[in-house]
Amino acid sequence: MASDEQWYVLVEASYGFTDTQWKLEEKCHVVGGRSAALSRAEEICRTWCPFGWKPEECGRTVFEVSETSWLVELIEERWPESDDHAYTRGEHFRVTVARVVHPKEAPPAHPPEKKAGAIRRAFGGGR
């Protein structure tokens, strides 16, 4: 194992009602190599919740898809005062351990060059 390897735990959550899509919600850098990343991923599977969910108010089933990937299903039951019955909502997210294989940062943005147009010249700008 190279000492400069970078390990991450990635959390992808589904969103949308009709055409569900996946979005990268968390990108957690882990120091300590692959085994530390696996431990952190298992912790995230047991504790992480999407926005609007409370861990203490939902059921959770963790599925190990592979040695480095999990699918977590959350289920919550509520009984609003205005209804005569309870309802159930569900959500799921993926947790994956990943090693960075090609890091390339985006180049920094620069302000656009000011252009001397006809109006700018009329007011003395762009000389």
Residue ranges of model-derived segments:
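Short, mixed-charge low-complexity intrinsically disordered segments
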Residues: 47-127
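Short, well-structured hydrophobic secondary-structure segments
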Residues: 32-39, 46-50
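Generic hydrophobic secondary-structure signal
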Residues: 9-11, 30, 106
